[in-house]
UniProtKB/Swiss-Prot annotation:
GO terms for biological process: translation. Residues 44-79 are annotated as: Disordered. InterPro entries: Ribosomal_uL4, Ribosomal_uL4-like, Ribosomal_uL4_dom_sf. Part of the 50S ribosomal subunit. This is Large ribosomal subunit protein uL4. The keyword Secreted does not apply. NCBIfam families: rplD_bact.
Amino acid sequence: MELPVNSFDKKEASTLTVADSAFGSEYKEGLVHQVVNAYLAGGRAGTKAQKTRREVSGGGAKPWRQKGTGRARAGSSRSPLWRSGGVAFAAKPRDFTQKVNRKMYRSAMASILSELIRREQLVVVDSLKLNEPKTRELKESLKKLNLGNVLIIIDGDDRNINLASRNMVGVSVCDALHVDPVSLVAAENIVVTVDAVKRLEERLS
């Protein structure tokens, strides 16, 4: 398939031939949901820990005798029913990692990119270079594309673009080798350079 390559004057400059497997696949909602959830789960620390009644310090002595006080019977002051007691079904550290194999991950990424193209939320530009790390220069370039919140995907690390975008609200920059499914799903619009498209195609092939 062919993608239109835009210049920053919003005119169609040329076209870029890309693989259907990477940018023209069908949208697999179930797979995308699974991969996004697995990615988010992998970012969880899993360090939450609470104490059960046996782990809370104290509570060894019976608070009062079994009968004759008129109060409900109690065997320990560390019961989950009591203030400062243990927690019933206390949370323990655990690993939230979900297994996603490489084929599933690549298929989900291709599915997301293809859907973004169909919805016209992905714009390919010939290049994005800044002479200096100036926010004004980057803002003027993006303004020509008439986009709102945007994720910029570039090939490699561009110091000028990274510095220029740091204090721009709604603008984030990512390298094509490290872009993740959550960033793609969350983005309102995506600007990709031609070099980044080729890198994504290599990555998903």
